[in-house]
Amino acid sequence: MARVKRAVNAHKKRRVILERAKGYRGQRSRLYRKAKEQLLHSFVYSYGDRRKRKGDFRRLWIQRINAASRANGLTYNRLIQGLKAASIEVDRRMLSELAVNDAAAFAGLVKLAKAALPADTSAPVAN
C-alpha cells in the first residue's frame, strides 16, 4: 500500500485556524493550539450571546417605552395594563419604535390605555 503524506492537509488545517483567529491578542492569534482553544471558546460565546441578544433588546424596548409613557403621565406597568384592557395588541418592539419615532401616535395609545384603565386611586402616578 502506498504511503500517504498529510503535510499539505495539516498545513491547510492550521492555516485556516490561524486565519480565523486574526485579531485576537498575543499567542491566541499566532500559536495554533492557543488559537484553536480560543476559537472554540469564541463559538461558545457567539452561541450564547445570540440568545442573550433577544433579552437585551427586550430590556431596551421596555426602558424606552417606560421613559416615553412617563413623559405622558403613565408608568410602563399601567400602560401595558391599560393596553390589554383596551384590547390593543401591540408588542414592545412596535411600542418602542412608536415612542422613539412617532411621539404623537404613542401619545394616542397612552390616551387609549388611560381611558381603558379602571379608576384606581391607589395606583402610582408618574411624575
UniProtKB/Swiss-Prot annotation:
| UniProt record, GO biological process | ribosomal large subunit assembly; translation
Entry annotated with the keyword rRNA-binding? yes
Any one Gene Ontology molecular-function term assigned to this protein's record: rRNA binding
Q: One short Pfam family name for this protein?
A: Ribosomal_L20
GO CC terms, sorted: ribonucleoprotein complex; ribosome
CDD domains for the chain: Ribosomal_L20
Give the record's keywords alphabetically.
Ribonucleoprotein, Ribosomal protein, RNA-binding, rRNA-binding
Q: Which InterPro entries match?
A: Ribosomal_bL20 (IPR005813), RIBOSOMAL_L20_CS (IPR049946), Ribosomal_protein_bL20_C (IPR035566)
Name the SUPFAM superfamilies for this protein. Ribosomal protein L20 (SSF74731)
Keyword Amino-acid biosynthesis in record: no
Q: Could you tell me what this protein does?
A: Binds directly to 23S ribosomal RNA and is necessary for the in vitro assembly process of the 50S ribosomal subunit. It is not involved in the protein synthesizing functions of that subunit.
HAMAP family membership: Ribosomal_bL20
Q: Which NCBIfam families match?
A: rplT_bact
Indicate the family of this protein.
Belongs to the bacterial ribosomal protein bL20 family.
In its UniProt entry, what is this protein called? Answer: Large ribosomal subunit protein bL20
